[in-house]
Amino acid sequence: MLRHRDTARQRYAAPFVNALNALARPVFGGDVDFQLSEELQVETRSHDGQTIDFGDLSGGAKEQLGILTRFAIAQLVAGGGAPVVIDDALGSTDATRLQLMSTLFDRVGRQAQVIVFTCMPGRFSRVPGRTELSMKKLKSV
């Protein structure tokens, strides 16, 4: 049983880390790398020769990594086409990373549907090609 578990983990771990690393490069830098736990959860982030435990990352970095993780899983599950729902995120993200994340939202949104619920639409105002719908508009549909 353990052998089958380990085989399944290996089958999913490498593609997940590869997708996560590719998505994270524009946000965290070109040499970013993540290490996973046995449960396929991010344990550490390495960048510029420094490795940081997940728990020691800033709130903004954790929030960004949570979104990147969803994007990576969506790419793997449906070959890039699974919808991703984001609920009022990026509140702890600085302006520079917010711009980088906006570019990433656009890139992912070209391959899959990305739905963002927010009470702060300004956080996502830099996402090219976005469609904004107010709650009033959504209720009338």
Language model segments and positions:
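Conserved, well-folded catalytic cores of nucleic-acid-processing
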Residues: 23-31, 74, 108-111
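GG-anchored amphipathic helix commonly corresponding to the ABC/SMC/Rad50 NBD signature/C-loop
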Residues: 59-85, 108
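Conserved ABC ATPase signature
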Residues: 9-17, 42-69, 89-99
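Charged, surface-exposed helical/loop "interaction arms" that form contiguous linear patches used
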Residues: 1-29, 49
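Long, charged, glycine-rich C-terminal linkers/tails
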Residues: 28-47, 84-85
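C-terminal lobe/lid and adjacent interdomain/linker elements of RecA-like ASCE P-loop ATPase modules
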Residues: 22, 96-141
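N-terminal/domain-start segments enriched in small and hydrophobic, helix-friendly residues
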Residues: 4-10, 79-80, 84-92
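Residue-level signal for beta-strand positions within conserved beta-sheet cores that form or flank
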Residues: 30, 38, 80, 110, ...
